[in-house]
């Protein structure tokens, strides 16, 4: 392998694919090699040629691609936040689905040989956004507390006209609980129910 052959191989590399620090190290070595091949061949020993080829190969071997840096960033973000172990059942399905999709996309790109830096950077951004947009569901305790409160109101205890008004709100709350809710939703529903209950009129004692 001659120094010229090695330089020709290096010339085919594209600067935009590599980190600037590692590219600079390679180019410094290339400059030395270019000076070296200008020398009179009669003055160059075989050992010097072997050493120069070796130095060029080492400088080429230390190149770090921008893609590998982006992959590492993405891997580190997933690992440090333990995203692959996250219990997505704790979150509203709509937000959990977006997150799962972003995580799957990121993991696919990490394994992909031909992933570009742009794709990887975009995947990281989407994953970060999806993580911050995850919204916790209300806990079972919070939902059950509201259901228990609802059970306390029985139609037989109140006048027909006041129950009729209350029942509209009661049914709205009941319908809302059929869907997923955040803690704030459950708190708001509880307040709405309590407010409506204040207008209930107890039936007179008929004994």
Q: What name fits each language-model region?
A:
Residues 1-207:
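Beta-rich interaction/scaffold domains
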């Amino acid at each position: 392998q001659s120094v010229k052959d090695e330089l020709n191989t290096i010339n085919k590399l594209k600067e935009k694919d590599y980190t600037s620090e590692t590219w600079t190290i390679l180019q410094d070595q290339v400059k030395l090699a270019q000076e070296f091949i200008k020398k009179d061949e009669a003055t160059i020993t075989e050992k010097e040629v072997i050493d120069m080829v070796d130095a060029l190969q080492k400088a080429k071997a230390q190149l770090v691609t921008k893609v590998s840096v982006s992959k590492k960033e993405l891997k580190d973000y997933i690992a440090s936040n333990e995203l692959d172990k996250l219990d997505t059942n704790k979150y509203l399905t709509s937000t959990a689905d977006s997150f799962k999709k972003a995580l799957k996309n990121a993991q696919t790109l990490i394994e992909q040989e031909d992933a570009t830096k742009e794709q990887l950077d975009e995947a990281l951004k989407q994953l970060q956004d999806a993580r911050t947009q995850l919204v916790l569901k209300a806990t079972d305790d919070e939902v059950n507390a509201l259901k228990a409160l609802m059970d306390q109101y029985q139609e037989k205890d109140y006048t027909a006209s006041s129950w009729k008004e209350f029942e509209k709100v009661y049914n709205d709350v009941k319908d809302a609980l059929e869907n997923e809710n955040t803690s704030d939703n459950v708190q708001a529903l509880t307040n709405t129910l309590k407010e409506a209950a204040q207008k209930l009129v107890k039936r007179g004692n008929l004994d």
